[in-house]
From Swiss-Prot:
GO cellular component, one term: cytoplasm
Main localization, broad class: cytoplasm
Keyword line: Cytoplasm, Endonuclease, Hydrolase, Magnesium, Metal-binding, Nuclease
CC cofactor note: Binds 1 Mg(2+) ion per subunit. May bind a second metal ion at a regulatory site, or after substrate binding.
One Gene Ontology term of the molecular function aspect: magnesium ion binding
EC assignment: 3.1.26.4
Name of the featured protein: Ribonuclease H
Family: Belongs to the RNase H family.
Gene (name only): rnhA
Organism of origin: Nitrosomonas europaea (strain ATCC 19718 / CIP 103999 / KCTC 2705 / NBRC 14298)
């Protein structure tokens, strides 16, 4: 991919996992920047798959703050296997905001606080949102999936202590 001068590419893969829905959940992030790979994961004891997918994207964009300042602007490509996240942030969020965070049938948007946070973070950067088919052999997505499951295990380990 050809980038304009003064722009650095950040490639991000995110995933969420949930054992039961609601149930124990985890999120995972694989971030690639300047030849370096950074990985993050976490989890919650009672959550949903959609909340974990959203939290993965939020944690990924928050992680951009910790990247070294190269004096160049960042172009972010975020890959998710969640159409809920990809379509939500690319298409639906604009209508939700116009309607006061209500859906087309006038119901409150689920996970509103997370959507607001993701919307705010995504406006700080030049983010392109991509949907990838999950569990289809895509290296970045497979890695994010493994990290999300590690997030679930981390919660189970805490419960066992």
């Amino acid at each position: 991919m050809q980038l304009e001068e003064g722009v650095k590419l950040v490639e991000i893969f995110t995933d969420g996992a949930c054992k039961g829905n609601p149930g124990i959940g985890g999120w995972g992030v694989c971030l690639k920047f300047d030849g370096e790979v950074r990985e993050f994961f976490g989890g919650e004891p009672v959550t949903t798959n959609n909340r974990m997918e959203l939290l993965a994207a939020i944690r990924a964009l928050q992680a951009l703050e910790s990247l070294p300042d190269t004096g160049q602007s960042l172009r972010v490509q975020l890959h998710t296997d969640s159409q809920y996240v990809q379509k939500g942030i690319s298409e639906w969020v604009h209508s939700w905001k116009k309607r006061g965070w209500l859906t087309a049938d006038k119901k409150p948007v689920k996970n509103e606080a997370l959507w607001k946070e993701l919307d705010q973070l995504s406006r700080r950067y030049q983010v392109e949102w991509f949907w990838v088919r999950g569990h289809n052999g895509h290296d970045g997505n497979e890695r994010a999936d493994m990290l999300a499951n590690r997030g679930v295990v981390s919660v189970l380990s805490e419960k066992a202590d």
